């Protein structure tokens, strides 16, 4: 592989650095007829991609530290290679492995396998070695019995999920036409200047400077002393699985929730002063259903035996949903902006399922098979999500400031994980991409965060045409601790919303079931 052109080093934004150096992975499955030709196509495409976007072959490092200065991470051209450096592209063969793809019966759609993500497909570990330069991206081509899986590892300190999706789109272009990538007018090449001159850089830098004046962070010695005296419990074993939700059921749920918007508006306005909500999306109700089900599962996992005294006191859990800032900042960021531009939107869910009689009377029709109390909980949470999104353009600066401030305070306090952390990639049209004759269409696109308890990734639309998009299932990769996962998979609302083949009851060490 020829060396990529040099580029001018640039600093990462405060929001980039707040996400930390951790690698996320995109797994893209293809069925190929000629393995050698497919491999050559990918290698050539990566060469072209690096020629057009050379910083992708860069590395992240601290510049020479300056005393009493705000030392920031930079992306720079790679230095001399070391023997233990992970190659830019690796090829590995996996005996007795098949593509992690499942064909739905009587359906034109492929969905990802429900099995856990295979870490052997990743070119490097999720967490890089501390105090050493780390790569921006790495690729691994995994050869299996019926095709290949191209894994893209991207450093979250440089890209968010949408930024990494731009790389996939550029790679598809370079596979199709390796001489004219980015020259057809539909997608230009994002430059490093777009990052340096980004309004998000100026805004986040200003907010972080203001935050630093207010935060009294401890010295490194104080931090070490606090950590050494703090008891640390071993994290519970985690499980990740892809859940396939029925598009028709979710549409029924959205329509039913929309039918009580007026009542929800009256209730929420009196409680929180939230503005009016005119519509709910399927993304809203699915996020609400997932968060409500996980909250119930966590509550049930803590109290596996139905002790009324324990269940009498409901628990309130905080959930997070990633929101893209690209269209909110002024001027708006381009859609192909590769840097981090997502911050969390926070909302709460309660394990209590007792709605007022007025609410029950307002419900004209609950989808068959769904408990009325749980339906109302989903509707309320979906309303809260949509109301917060409607006001996000007015409040995102405060949210961004809080996000950056929390990053500063992680040195002083123990940041507890959320009940559920939802990110939606549904709108990314990955399956419509064409990768040329040797690779063809994507058979499945997978990603997840199997090391984060509560992470929920709504995967891209698994349809290669807008004509069938409305009936395409919703695929969600969810990671939970083992006991919560058992309870989650037995939640009635979840089983109702899944496609038929995923509805069987799961038996665990205890039959977990929260009160409804």
From Swiss-Prot:
InterPro entries assigned to the protein according to its UniProt record, in alphabetical order: CAT-like_dom_sf, Plant_Fungal_Acyltransferase
Family to which the UniProt record says this protein belongs: Belongs to the fumigaclavine B O-acetyltransferase family.
Described purpose of this protein according to its UniProt entry: O-acyltransferase; part of the gene cluster B that mediates the biosynthesis of austinol and dehydroaustinol, two fungal meroterpenoids. The first step of the pathway is the synthesis of 3,5-dimethylorsellinic acid by the polyketide synthase ausA. 3,5-dimethylorsellinic acid is then prenylated by the polyprenyl transferase ausN. Further epoxidation by the FAD-dependent monooxygenase ausM and cyclization by the probable terpene cyclase ausL lead to the formation of protoaustinoid A.
Subunit structure: Monomer.
Name by which UniProt lists this protein: O-acyltransferase ausQ
Keywords for the protein's UniProt record, in alphabetical order: Acyltransferase, Transferase
Upper classification of the organism: Eukaryota, Fungi, Dikarya, Ascomycota, Pezizomycotina
This enzyme's EC code(s): 2.3.1.-
Pathway in which this enzyme or protein is active: Secondary metabolite biosynthesis; terpenoid biosynthesis
Stored Pfam families: Transferase
Other known facts: In A.calidoustus, the austinoid gene cluster lies on a contiguous DNA region, while clusters from E.nidulans and P.brasilianum are split in their respective genomes. Genetic rearrangements provoked variability among the clusters and E.nidulans produces the least number of austionoid derivatives with the end products austinol and dehydroaustinol, while P.brasilianum can produce until acetoxydehydroaustin, and A.calidoustus produces the highest number of identified derivatives.
Molecular functions per Gene Ontology: acyltransferase activity, transferring groups other than amino-acyl groups
Gene Ontology biological process terms from the UniProt entry: terpenoid biosynthetic process
Endoplasmic reticulum recorded as keyword: no
């Amino acid at each position: 592989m020829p060396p990529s052109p040099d580029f001018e080093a640039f600093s990462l934004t405060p929001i980039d650095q707040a996400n930390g150096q951790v690698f996320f992975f995109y797994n893209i499955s293809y069925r190929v007829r000629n393995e050698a030709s497919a491999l050559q196509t990918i290698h050539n495409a990566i060469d072209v991609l690096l020629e057009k976007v050379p910083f992708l072959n860069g590395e992240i490092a601290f510049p020479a530290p300056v005393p009493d200065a705000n030392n920031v991470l930079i992306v720079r051209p790679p230095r001399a290679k070391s023997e233990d450096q992970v190659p830019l592209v690796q090829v590995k063969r996996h005996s007795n492995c098949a593509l992690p793809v499942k064909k739905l019966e009587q359906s034109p759609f492929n969905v990802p396998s429900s099995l856990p993500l295979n870490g052997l497909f990743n070119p490097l570990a999720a967490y890089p070695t501390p105090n050493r330069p780390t790569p921006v991206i790495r690729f691994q081509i995994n050869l299996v019995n019926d095709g290949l899986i191209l894994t893209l590892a991207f450093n979250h300190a440089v890209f968010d999920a949408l930024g990494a999706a731009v790389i996939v789109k550029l790679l598809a272009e370079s596979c199709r036409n390796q001489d004219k990538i980015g020259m057809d007018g539909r997608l230009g090449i994002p430059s490093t200047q777009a990052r340096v001159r980004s309004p998000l850089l100026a805004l986040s830098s200003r907010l972080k400077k203001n935050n630093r004046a207010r935060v009294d962070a401890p010295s490194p010695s104080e931090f070490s002393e606090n950590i050494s005296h703090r008891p640390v419990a071993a994290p519970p074993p985690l499980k990740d699985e892809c859940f396939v939700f029925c598009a028709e059921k979710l549409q029924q749920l959205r329509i039913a929730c929309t039918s009580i918007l007026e009542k929800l508006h009256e209730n929420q306005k009196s409680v929180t002063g939230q503005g009016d909500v005119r519509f709910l999306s399927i993304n809203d109700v699915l996020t609400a259903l997932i968060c409500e089900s996980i909250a119930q599962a966590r509550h049930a996992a803590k109290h596996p035996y139905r002790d009324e005294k324990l269940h009498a006191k409901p628990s309130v859990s905080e959930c997070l949903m990633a929101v893209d800032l690209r269209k909110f900042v002024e001027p708006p960021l381009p859609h192909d902006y590769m840097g981090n531009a997502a911050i969390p939107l926070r909302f709460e869910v309660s394990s209590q399922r007792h709605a007022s009689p007025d609410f029950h009377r307002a419900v004209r029709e609950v989808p068959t098979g769904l408990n009325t109390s749980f339906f109302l909980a989903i509707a309320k949470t979906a309303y809260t999500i949509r109301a917060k999104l409607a006001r996000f353009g007015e409040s995102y600066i405060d949210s961004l400031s809080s996000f950056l401030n929390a990053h500063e305070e992680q040195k002083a306090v123990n940041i507890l994980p959320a009940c559920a952390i939802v990110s939606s990639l549904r709108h990314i049209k990955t399956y419509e991409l064409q990768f040329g004759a040797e690779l063809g269409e994507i058979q499945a696109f997978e990603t997840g965060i199997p090391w984060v308890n509560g992470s929920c990734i709504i995967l891209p639309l698994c349809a290669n045409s807008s004509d069938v998009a409305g009936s395409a299932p919703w695929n969600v990769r969810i990671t939970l601790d083992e006991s919560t996962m058992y309870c989650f998979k037995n939640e009635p609302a979840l089983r109702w919303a899944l496609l038929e083949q995923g509805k069987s009851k799961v038996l665990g060490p205890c039959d977990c079931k929260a009160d409804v």
